[in-house]
Structures are given as C-alpha cells and as structure tokens.
A protein has these predicted regions:
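Glycine-rich flexible loops
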Residues: 1-411
Length: 411
C-alpha cells in the first residue's frame, strides 16, 4: 500500500487539487498507519474503528470553494447538494461540518462528527480543516472521493456566483485571485498524435486488409488510445481520471473499460464488434452505447469524452424562469447552445445520452452533455477530437469570466 500512497499523492499534486503539505493518507493493516507522522493519527485511528474502511485521505483543497459554499448555505443545513453528474454518480450529496461546530470541541467530539458523516457518504468537508475521503478497499477510492469533491465544489461555486452573485465579505477578492491564476489557456505544445486512419496505418503492410486486424497492427490503435487518454488527464480535462475514449476501425470499436483510468489504459481497452456479435463489451465503458451510436450515424472514427469544468458550468447555466422541469440532466428538451456548441440532456449508459449525443455531435463533431462533460470526435484520428475539446473548454472559460464580469462587476 506504500506504493499506492506515493502514486496517488503524486496524482493529487499533478491535478493541483490538494495543498502539498496537507496530504495525509491513512491505511489499515494490523494497525492504522500514515504516510507522515502527525497530530491527527490518534483521532483518525478512532475514525477507522467506527467505519468499515481500509484507507482514508485527509487534505486541504487548493481552492477555497468548499468552505465558501458552506458559508453561503442557510443556517441549519449540513449538506451541499450539487446538480452535476459526477456528484449524482459518486457522492449524491456532500455532508459538511461547520467550523463553529468543531472549533473548541474535543477530538473525541470531532471524531464522532466525522464518523457520522462518513457512515452515510464517501467523503465530507470539514470547514477550515479540509476534506476527508474514505476507501472501502483501496487508496484509489479515497483519491477519487477527494477529487470528486474538488471537481463538484469548483463547478457548484462558480455556477452559484453567476446565478446569485457574491454573498460574503472578501468573496470578490478571493474570486479575483482565482481568476488571475486560472484564466489561462493550457499549453498544448509538444503533444504528438498518430495521423489516421489508424487502421490504415496499422495494416499498411497488409493487403488485402484482414478483418479483424491481427494483434500486432492493433497495437498501434491501442498505443494511441493510451497516449491520448494520458493527454486528457494531464491537461485537466477530467475529474480525477474518469472519462472514456474509443476508436472505430470500420468493424470494431476499441474502447476504454468501465471505471478505468484514462492515464493508465494499458490492458484496459476492449475490442467490441460494432454489430454486437460478441460479449467483449461486458467490461467496456458504460457509455459504449453512445460511442456506438456516433459511429453508426456519422463518419467519425475517434471519440473522446471528458469532464472539462468550465464547459460543465456553462451547460448548467439556464435563465429559464418558472420551468417545471427539475431533473434537467435527464429531461430538458430545450434546444440550447453555449459558445455555438449544442447542449444535450441524457443519462449515461444506455439512457437518453445514447440517443441525444449522436444526433448533436454529427454536424460539428462536438457537443456538451448537461452537467456532465464534452464529447468530441475526429474523422480519422484523435488530433481533431482532442483539439475540439480543448477549444470548447477554452472558449467556455473565456465566456465564463466575461459573464462573471457582466453579472457581478468583477474585473
């Protein structure tokens, strides 16, 4: 488990989600131990005793949005209820402990508060101290919970600023500092993409082209999927490492497996016949039906799906008043766009998204799913798909800060 702790510590630093000197992993072997000796070990040992877990992460977020959201909540509330897709899938809601509740309390009382929160949810916010996230079986699960809280509080806070403005003293100053640090275009220089069609590159020495491709030529497709998956994580276009990616060679969809890490796809790519003639798709991404629908309805060969945050925020910004639809991510039937890109509703997996995305993506090769993320496609290879995703997220980031200035007067 020591190797896993080192691995996920590095991922937190890469993601810019946790303050470096605040990262504390705790693990249960015969006894609870930690990656660094600290004053919290005794308390979290008691937390382990109250829960059925093997790992726990305690760290401060690099952005203050979680604490600000707690302060913006009405007195008496103890949960944040974001509406983005990742929260609904992984957390449902986020319990929190207000600073005034734990400040001055004994560590025994704080332990009781933490256990109460974590018996119901995988992670919780302790205002002024940090986020605590659990792993029932693995360190990775604790990392995912922490990363999801960073993602969802980022999305919820910035969306709330657009809709409700600033509510707290010094909130505008904090926002301006965030804007200076984050309103910049990611550096995409140095990214290398294999020109497509990849199956032609892979089988260029074979005539006639066999079906399916033999193992060695397939490796070019696998290698490119792995590389582009890493790019997607490294450039911050996902939360933690979730998303999915696929390539279609005319008969077979090569797609990342469900719950796989986009930055570690080696050995986790499934070849799935598009006609459904095998059971290979059983471990494939839950969004395989959406990828299949795109390939059946368009000339695209490469599809990339990520969760860029500013695109998600603007997809959820709606000025419709007195709308009777509450479950917008599933039921909204309005035709909406942001920065010229269509926004669609639909559940993941075999739900409405498998119908809405293929139709929406057909013309431009890109669309945004409400509260969820971007689907981008390329006709021959992943270069266009990746660059479309980056371009849309950049435009949404610029539009977000334009709207924030317009609505709040921020400069």
């Amino acid at each position: 488990m020591h190797d896993q702790i080192a691995k996920y510590t590095q991922k937190l630093l890469r993601d810019r989600t946790a303050v470096p000197d605040s990262i504390h992993f705790y693990r249960l072997d015969d006894v609870v131990s930690t990656n660094r000796q600290d004053e919290w070990l005794a308390m979290f040992t008691e937390v382990f005793q109250g829960l059925d877990i093997t790992a726990l992460l305690f760290a401060r977020l690099t952005l203050p949005f979680a604490d600000l959201l707690v302060d913006r909540e009405e007195p008496g509330t103890h949960r944040l209820v974001p509406k983005d897709s990742e929260t609904k899938v992984f957390l449902h809601d986020i319990p929190f402990i207000r600073k005034k509740e734990w400040e001055g309390a004994s560590k025994t009382d704080l332990t009781t508060m933490i256990v109460r929160c974590l018996k119901e949810r995988k992670a919780a916010i302790i205002q002024g101290l940090g986020v605590v996230s659990t792993g029932g079986v693995t360190v990775e699960q604790a990392y995912i919970g922490f990363s999801t809280i960073f993602h969802t509080t980022f999305v919820k806070y910035l969306l709330d600023v657009l809709t409700d403005g600033f509510k707290l003293p010094n909130e505008r100053m904090v926002f301006e500092g965030f804007k200076l640090a984050w309103n910049r275009t990611p550096d995409l220089s140095g990214l290398v993409f294999t020109p497509g069609p990849l199956e032609r590159t892979a089988a260029s020495h074979l005539s006639p082209r066999p079906n399916p491709l033999p193992q060695e030529p397939r490796e070019i497709i696998y290698k490119e999927i792995c590389q582009v998956g890493r790019y997607t994580v490294e450039k911050g276009f996902v939360d933690s490492f979730f998303g999915n990616i696929s390539y279609f060679d005319g008969t077979t969809i090569y797609i990342s497996q469900t719950t796989s890490s986009l930055d570690e796809l080696e050995g986790f790519i499934d070849p799935v016949p598009i006609d459904g003639s095998s059971t290979a798709g059983l471990s494939a991404s839950s969004e395989l039906p959406t990828h299949r629908g795109i390939y059946l309805d368009s000339p695209y060969r490469a599809v990339l799906h990520g969760h860029p945050r500013f695109s998600i925020i603007l997809s959820m910004l709606c000025d419709e008043k007195n709308c009777g639809i509450k479950d917008c991510n599933r039921l909204c039937n309005r035709t909406r766009t942001v920065c010229g890109v269509p926004i669609v509703a639909g559940e993941t997996g075999a739900g409405g998204m498998a119908k809405s995305v293929p139709a929406a993506i057909k013309e431009q090769g890109v669309c945004i799913v409400y509260g969820h993320g971007i689907f981008a496609a390329g006709e021959k290879d992943f270069r266009k798909a990746f660059m479309k995703m980056a371009e849309v997220e950049n435009r949404c980031r610029e539009e977000y800060f334009r709207l924030s200035e317009e609505r709040t007067g921020s400069k």
